């Protein structure tokens, strides 16, 4: 398991992402929209820069649900590759089995 501080940091980032999601998406739409005047677009860029850095979804790291491992994460299962293999060998994942040919 990762350190407690790492887990809490990820939880905090997730809360901030959810809190600022709507505001951030509206500002991004304004920045991309060419119909809006350049001054308004520039103001939207400045407002976007004032939002907390951790409110950006790209700052969130996918982690294994059982071990907290950040690498070799499989989105489909929410687990790392080792835990997917263990679960598959135990038959805990329906429809998944070791290939053989």
UniProtKB/Swiss-Prot annotation:
Gene: rpsN
Homology family: Belongs to the universal ribosomal protein uS14 family.
InterPro entries: Ribosomal_uS14, Ribosomal_uS14_bac/plastid, Ribosomal_uS14_CS
Subunit record text: Part of the 30S ribosomal subunit. Contacts proteins S3 and S10.
SUPFAM superfamilies assigned: Glucocorticoid receptor-like (DNA-binding domain)
GO cellular component, one term: cytoplasm
Protein known as: Small ribosomal subunit protein uS14
One Gene Ontology biological process: translation
Species, as recorded: Blochmanniella floridana
MF terms in GO: rRNA binding; structural constituent of ribosome
Assigned keywords, A-Z: Ribonucleoprotein, Ribosomal protein, RNA-binding, rRNA-binding
Function: Binds 16S rRNA, required for the assembly of 30S particles and may also be responsible for determining the conformation of the 16S rRNA at the A site.
């Amino acid at each position: 398991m990762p350190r407690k501080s790492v887990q809490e940091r990820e939880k905090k980032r997730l809360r901030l992402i959810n809190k600022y999601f709507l505001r951030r998406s509206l500002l991004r739409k304004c920045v991309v929209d060419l119909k809006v005047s350049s001054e308004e677009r520039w103001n939207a860029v400045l407002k976007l820069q004032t939002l907390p850095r951790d409110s950006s979804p790209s700052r969130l790291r996918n982690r294994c649900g059982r071990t907290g491992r950040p690498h070799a994460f499989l989105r489909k299962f929410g687990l790392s590759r080792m835990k997917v293999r263990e679960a598959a060998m135990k038959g805990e994942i329906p429809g998944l089995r070791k290939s053989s040919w």
